[in-house]
């Protein structure tokens, strides 16, 4: 049985990464994202702080080229200790 993708590659694909607001969080996330999406432009990074400033939400819109790329990127982000949640 083959797994059919609902996504047509290449495409712009937003990834939302959340974690506690701490030194090095943004840089760590960007480093991981650039490992799997080397063309990601830092200037397009969207950063939002929670109401009380305890958490950060980063949205990285990458140029996704394959399901394998997305799966690997999500796994690397999920495994990082500073990342609390991914969407």
Curated annotation (Swiss-Prot):
Coiled-coil positions: none
Domain of life of the source: Bacteria
Annotated signal peptide: none
SUPFAM superfamilies in alphabetical order: YbeD/HP0495-like (SSF117991)
Name of a matching Pfam family: DUF493
A single Gene Ontology CC term: cytosol
InterPro entries: UPF0250_YbeD-like, YbeD-like_sf
Family: Belongs to the UPF0250 family.
Database matches in PANTHER family: UPF0250 PROTEIN YBED
Name the record gives this protein: UPF0250 protein NE1487
